Regions:
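Catalytic nucleotidyl-transfer cores of nucleotide-processing enzymes
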Residues: 150-163
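N-terminal regions immediately upstream of nucleotidyltransferase
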Residues: 1-111, 128
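Catalytic metal-binding acidic patch
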Residues: 113-148, 156
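Functionally constrained cores in energy, signaling, and assembly domains
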Residues: 77, 82, 92, 135-137, ...
Length: 163
């Protein structure tokens, strides 16, 4: 009986460090270095897929390690998984609009709203579940808007997400 608390303390120290790292991942923005984006011959879509994929896989690995140590963390992990996916979607949209399809003077027809629906929208997303997104555009959509949505979807598909 005396050894049991020691074992719990040993298990809690690594899990606390993992949880801190997970929170840090959620708080740290996913940004592409502006120096890289201006270099000639850079395939921005491939760069985004690499950077976003690295972030997402690293964060998922952290969640898996936490769950391996503490299976009772599952309800929180579902919320964190949704938040990580949310951050990935937001970063994808922002980077596509700012780096791949920048527009200096957008009109009212060049606006896009992305909504999360289903389990993802409720922040109850299980690992490997599909991601339900709703794109809302103005009645008169432009070629720019179609290109942005297409690029967002291709990047998310390249990340092996089920959209």
């Amino acid at each position: 009986m005396i050894d049991a608390p020691k074992k719990n303390l040993v298990k809690q120290k690594p899990i606390q460090a993992l949880k801190k790292q997970l929170l840090l991942n959620l708080e740290t923005p996913i940004q592409i270095d502006p120096k890289i984006t201006t270099a000639a011959g850079i395939d921005m879509r491939a760069l985004l897929v690499t950077e976003l994929g690295s972030y997402y896989q690293g964060s998922r690995d952290l969640l898996k390690k936490i769950l391996d140590i503490d299976p009772l963390y599952a309800p929180k992990a579902v919320n964190y998984y949704s938040l990580l996916t949310d951050k990935l979607i937001i970063s994808t949209v922002e980077n596509v609009i700012n780096l791949i399809h920048p527009i200096s003077n957008p009109t009212n027809s060049e606006k896009i709203c992305v909504l999360a629906v289903g389990g993802f929208g409720r922040e109850q997303m299980a690992p490997f579940s599909d991601i339900d997104l709703l794109f809302i555009t103005p009645y008169k959509q432009t070629a720019w808007g179609e290109s942005v949505i297409e690029s967002i979807l291709y990047i998310l598909w390249d990340l092996k997400l089920k959209i």
